[in-house]
Amino acid sequence: MNQVKLIALIFVFFLGSSFSRKNEAHDIHVSKCNIDFSNEEKTLQITMHIYLDDLEADIAKGGVTEKLHLLTEKEHADGDKFLLEYFQKKFRLQVNQKDVSYNFLGKEITEDLLGGWFYLEVENVQELKELKINYEILTDLYNDQQSVIKIKGSNKKKGYFLLNSKKKEANVTF
């Protein structure tokens, strides 16, 4: 039953984003995160899709008073610094029961201009046996925030999770 709900939520998310326009607000509060283990590169490659208005509102709620204008011509000079600080506070990982840090690789705007793709990477992951995710992105902003987490680990094993303001953690054993 949970898989049916997850598939329906993903469908609504993609359908809604394909008809969005720049000036329209969105009523659904969903972010998504893909985490892929690269055995060849010994890295975790992380891709997140987050709506920009929500992201900037949550960063401001955390105490940043400057308007960031992320992924626009007027982007704040320290936009990437504020993003990394936000991600470090709201997105934590443990690999094989050890806390890991990640590098912020970059960002790009989505086709509908409402969201952004954000790229992170954890280096020196020799083997992936266990992954613990703490994902609190936007969960303090909206009670109905949903986060779809897709993980591809060793031997192409996949895991799908739906996290929200009540359930912020997921554990996967490979």
List each model region and its residues:
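Bacterial Sec-dependent N-terminal signal peptides
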Residues: 1-26
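N-terminal soluble domains immediately following signal/targeting peptides that reside
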Residues: 23-174
